[in-house]
């Protein structure tokens, strides 16, 4: 999963960076999962935090890099016309991972993922899309590709160190997530 220059993460030929907002969320979730594992080595795999971490890793480092331009990641006008170029991956009904990509350079930036305080809920003040739009309007994360990439490259060594650490306690959960078959269309 690592490659390119030292400290970078490369998956399916795409270099992946994480904005500091995403890194902070990923780090907090890893700490939470590790604490749960130390308290309950057998039962932590069934906890929401462990499943969420496994889903985030699977999306960010497996599914999205397979085809970041996929129509399943288009978010339409939910963020407003000015932010239509942002993509989002849905997981566990109310969670969204927001990202951008640049095809020519084969680069993906994972920008932000909502948490339990900002679950997707139509017309809620704390809705994931509404919260992310506020973050974009405040300039953090930046909307400009160049500024977003610059802000995210500073954390690439942290991401490279954190990703295997995060993957270790969630490997069993991740295998279960990968083997789930999608529901058949009606």
Name what the model sees in each region:
Residues 33, 40, 44, 64-65:
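Hydrophobic residues in alpha-helical segments
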């Amino acid at each position: 999963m690592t490659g390119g220059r030292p400290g970078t993460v490369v998956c399916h030929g795409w270099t992946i960076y994480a904005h500091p907002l995403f890194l902070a969320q990923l780090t907090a979730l890893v700490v939470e999962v590790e604490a749960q594992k130390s308290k309950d080595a057998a039962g932590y795999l069934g906890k929401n935090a462990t499943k969420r971490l496994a889903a985030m890793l699977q999306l960010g480092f497996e599914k999205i890099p397979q085809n970041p331009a996929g129509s399943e990641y288009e978010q339409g006008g939910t963020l407003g016309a000015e932010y239509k170029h942002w993509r989002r991956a849905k997981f566990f009904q109310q969670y969204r991972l927001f990202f951008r990509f640049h095809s020519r350079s084969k680069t993906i930036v994972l920008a932000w993922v909502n948490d339990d305080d900002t679950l997707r809920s139509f017309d809620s003040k704390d809705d994931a899309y509404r919260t992310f739009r506020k973050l974009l309007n405040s300039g953090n994360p930046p909307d400009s590709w160049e500024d977003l990439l610059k802000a995210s490259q500073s954390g690439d060594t942290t991401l490279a160190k954190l990703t295997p650490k995060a993957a270790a306690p969630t490997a069993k959960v991740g295998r279960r997530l990968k083997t789930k078959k999608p529901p058949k269309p009606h």
